[in-house]
Amino acid sequence: MAAVINNAMLEAILAEIRPLIGRGKVADYIPALASVSGDKLGIAISTVDGQHFAAGDAHERFSIQSISKVLSLVVAMNHYQEEEIWQRVGKDPSGQPFNSLLQLEIEQGKPRNPFINAGALVVCDMLQSRLSAPRQRMLEIVRRLSGVADIAYDPVVARSEFEHSARNAAIAWLMKSFGNFHNDVATVLQNYFHYCSLEMSCVELARTFLFLADRGIAPHLEAPVIAPIQSRQVNALMMTSGMYQNAGEFAWRVGLPAKSGVGGGIVAIVPQEMAIAVWSPELDDAGNSLAGVALLEKLTQRMGRSVF
C-alpha cells in the first residue's frame, strides 16, 4: 500500500507545487496569524501499518485553527448521546461562509454542521456544560493522540482572536436568543479560541488524526478513540463540510474527507490507509490553503487514491 510513498516522492511533489506560493493570502483578520511567513510548505503522512513520511516544513508547528473543530466534536461524542448532539447542530453543508449569521437567523439558531463557526461554538458550549476543565481536557486528548507531551495552546493567538471576536460573539448571542446556547458566552469563546490556537506540526497532526483512517482506533492506544460508526460519521462530515463552502470543489479535485483551518493546515483521511497533513499559510478566497489543496490534489493523483 505505502510502497509508492517515500520522502523523496513527497519532496518532488513539493517542488512542483512551490511555484503556487505567492498566489494566496495569509489570514490577516487575526493579527497574530498575519505575521506568519507565507512561503512555508510541508506535508506528513502516517499510515495505519505504522509508517511515517514527511517533507518540507513538516516539523514546524503552526496554529491549527478550525482543524480543532474535528477534535472538539470527537470529545463531545465521548460525553453525549448521539441524539443530544444532533438535535442542536445539523449534518448538512452550509454553502455559506464559515462565519455567516444570515443562515443561522433563518434556521432559528441551529447551525448546519459542527465545522462552521456556529456549529463549533455549540459543540464548545456542550463541552463547557459537561467537562470541569474543557481546555485542559482537550490538551490531554491531543497529547495522547499525538504521543507528544509538549503540544500547547498559543496564548498570543488565543488572546488576539478574543480581542477580535465580535462576529463570533454575535453568533453565540444569536443562538442564545433561540435557546441553543446555555453557558456564559465569553467563557465558551475563550475555550473555542484556545482550541483554535493549538500549535501542531504536520507530523503531529497526521499521527493525531490516524484514528479516523482506522475505524476510530489509534495504533498506540488500548481503547478506541471513538466507535467505528462514529469514525465513519466524522469522515462523512469532513467530506461534505470540512472545506468551508468549497467542499464540493475539494471533493472534485481531491476526493478525500478533509478539514482545513485558516492557519493554512489541512488534514485529509484515506480510510483504512492513512492520514495526511499539509501546511501552506497562504489561503484562497474560501479560507483554505491554496497550495495545500493543490498539494493534496497532486498527491492523490500520484497515489491513485480517492473515496470515489
From Swiss-Prot:
InterPro entries (alphabetical): Beta-lactam/transpept-like (IPR012338), Glutaminase (IPR015868)
Q: What Enzyme Commission number does this protein have?
A: 3.5.1.2
Family to which this protein belongs: Belongs to the glutaminase family.
- Binding-site residues for substrate, renumbered to this chain: 66, 117, 161, 168, 192, 244, 262
One Gene Ontology term of the biological-process aspect is: glutamate biosynthetic process
Q: Which reaction does it catalyse?
A: L-glutamine + H2O = L-glutamate + NH4(+)
| Top-tier EC class | hydrolase
Provide the protein name.
Glutaminase
Keyword match Aminoacyl-tRNA synthetase: no
What quaternary arrangement does the UniProt entry report?
A: Homotetramer.
What GO molecular functions are on record for this protein?
glutaminase activity
Q: Which UniProt keywords apply?
A: Hydrolase
Q: Which organism is it from?
A: Klebsiella pneumoniae (strain 342)
